[in-house]
Regions:
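Metal-coordinating catalytic core of metallo-dependent amide/deamination hydrolases
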Residues: 23-167
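Short, acidic/turn-prone active-site loops that include or flank metal/cofactor-
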Residues: 131, 188-193, 216-219
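His/Asp/Glu-enriched, well-ordered alpha-helical/loop segment
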Residues: 149, 153-160, 202-263
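Histidine/acidic-residue-rich catalytic or RNA/ligand-binding cores of hydrolases
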Residues: 60, 133-145, 171-179, 195-204, ...
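Single conserved hydrophobic/aromatic residue that forms the stacking wall/gate
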Residues: 1-12
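Glycine-enriched alpha-helix->loop->beta-strand junction motifs that scaffold or abut catalytic
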Residues: 115-124, 156-159, 176-185, 206-211, ...
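Catalytic beta/alpha-barrel core
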Residues: 161-169, 187-190, 214
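Conserved, mostly hydrophobic/aromatic
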Residues: 41, 98, 128, 177, ...
């Protein structure tokens, strides 16, 4: 928490994975780890939205978690309870939403069950999606659709949804997300560290999709550097300069990126 504050981050959303003891046994208070994060944020004065993560399997073709992932396990009921507990706790600067790790880590019926409990409540809903091409290939194999196309068709995406990474897309998916009002969260340092690839930044900006910056695995914790490398990565990928600039709208690259990131 403190490194985030030092890195000029004043308000963050935390994908909260770590729920249980080593080995997967629950704590006496099932929200123990959520309280630890929330209290750290309150102590440092950092605005925090805790996003308990639905995580139940190791992959689209794997029905269970690996032993080293059991600390992350959570049912839809459990995730909904954690969200409600944190939101009702009254801690200063602390709110709560929910997260679905990814289509590969949560089965469709479980996603449906969690969203049914969320209903129309005004809370953020995050999901990692289309981060790597292997995920896209697996999703095509198991569902017949690309990840963002599946999400847009299967669920009523709206402005509460934030699609984290959204690295590998086709125009039809970008159009569907734009129509829904959902946003994307690009995480340049993590995507670079993991070799994920480059999001189609010109297309996302051109479609008017709301964009935020994320650190995801906390490889970097300084948002100005994340913003810088968002543009630099695009320049390297496309072999051109001022990728984010829009001469007819906002000719200054930095200004357009900053406007997009803070809207």
């Amino acid at each position: 928490i403190m490194p985030s504050l030092v890195g000029s981050e004043m308000c963050i959303r935390d994908s909260h994975y770590l729920h249980h003891q080593p080995g997967g046994q629950p704590y006496a208070d099932e929200a123990t780890m959520a309280w630890a994060v929330a209290d750290a944020a309150a102590d440092t004065g950092l605005g925090l939205t805790v996003l308990p993560v639905l995580y139940e399997r190791a992959g689209l073709a794997q029905a269970a978690l690996r032993p080293d992932q059991r600390r992350f396990a959570g049912t839809p009921d459990f995730i909904a309870r954690l969200q409600a507990s944190v939101q009702a706790s009254g801690r200063p600067l602390v709110n709560a939403g929910v997260a679905i790790h990814s289509l590969r880590a949560a089965a469709s019926p479980s996603i449906d069950a969690l969203l049914a409990q969320v209903g129309d409540a005004a809370m953020p809903i995050h999901i990692h999606v289309a981060e790597q091409m292997q995920e896209v290939r697996d999703c095509l194999t198991h569902t017949g659709q690309r990840p963002m196309a599946w999400l847009a068709q299967r669920h009523a995406l709206d402005a509460r949804w934030q699609l984290v990474h959204a690295t590998h897309s086709v125009p039809e998916e970008i159009e569907a997300v734009a129509r829904s009002g959902a946003g994307i969260v690009i995480c340049p340092s993590t995507e670079g560290n993991l070799g994920d690839g480059f999001a189609d930044l010109p297309a996302w900006l051109g479609a008017g999709v709301p964009m935020a910056l994320g650190s995801d695995s906390h490889v970097g914790r300084q948002w100005p550097e994340e913003l810088r490398w968002l543009e630099y990565g695009q320049r390297l990928h496309l072999q051109q300069r001022n990728v984010a600039a829009a001469p007819a709208q906002q000719p200054a690259t930095a200004a357009r990126l900053l406007d997009a990131a803070v809207q």
